[in-house]
């Protein structure tokens, strides 16, 4: 390996490390003080870098938060959906999603809470962030609906159940549960809520032979 190649590799490693630190600092600050009170200067300070580096790397706070949400989406299901559901359709697809969220809750509860907190920042009147988060939700819902709809053709969805409606019901229920979990962690058992939702979905949408499990 030549000196120039080694130098390039070290530079890429430093760049990757600084990006990870900046994203982590952003997640921490947004969780602590909210999007509005988080500044590029504070992000840089928390990560141990200059304000100038943050601006050069991402350009704006909204672009930085979009990058963070995208990274967390890759980790927590949105971008991982095709892999998670590669062999499941109908009710099995919905249950597989809930199982994955349950695993994430057990393995990385604080990171998962941070992901949901960032998604709810999309409610703020920030056009770029609002559109980005709305599109992320829409894409996730569309992908999941296609997998559930395939179950109608394979017998893995109860006859008469509308794939789009039951998918939207599931996603809305998870988002609502996540909101309550963020609001009142001491009194909201997120895992129990997911398990309860799974049982109700089986009763609602599983083929008759699955309804008693």
Question: What are these regions, as identified by a protein language model?
Answer:
Residues 67, 81-112, 163-170, 194, ...:
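Hydrophobic alpha-helical connector segments
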Residues 130-134, 152-200, 208-213:
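Hydrophobic/aromatic-rich alpha-helical bundle segments in the mid-to-C-terminal region
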Residues 1-33, 40-46, 63-66:
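Basic, helix-initiating cap at the start of DNA-binding domains
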Residues 32-36, 87, 108, 154:
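Short coil/turn segments at alpha/beta junctions that flank glycine-rich nucleotide-binding fingerprints
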Residues 47-58:
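Short hydrophobic/aromatic patch on the recognition helix
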Residues 58, 117-125:
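Short helix-capping/turn signature of helix-turn-helix
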Residues 77, 107-110, 127-154, 165-168:
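Amphipathic alpha-helical packing segments from all-alpha helical-bundle domains
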Residues 16-24, 36-37, 57-81, 95, ...:
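An amphipathic alpha-helix adjacent to DNA-recognition modules
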